[in-house]
Amino acid sequence: ARLGQGVLLNLNALVCHDCEVGDFVEISPGAILTGACSVGDFSFIGSGAVLKPGVTVGKHAIVAAGAVVTEDVPDNAMVAGVPAKLKKSV
């Protein structure tokens, strides 16, 4: 895994093999980034969220607490739910 500058990795958060996390990303408590995930700069991963293998989260994106991300998240998007769906652009 590679963590960028200024990443906030909270309690019990898990970043698995081959993940790339950009600069100034917040990964909330209990979030799980499974293998080969990518998170863009200035993004937020909510508590208990799960990113499935190979998922890419764009820059300035928000993943809500408890979301299960099974598809790529575009830049400047907010996703929520199980499975995660686009809720709005930010």
What residue spans do the PLM features occupy?
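Structural signal for interior beta-strand "rungs" in well-ordered beta-sheet cores
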Residues: 1-80, 84-87
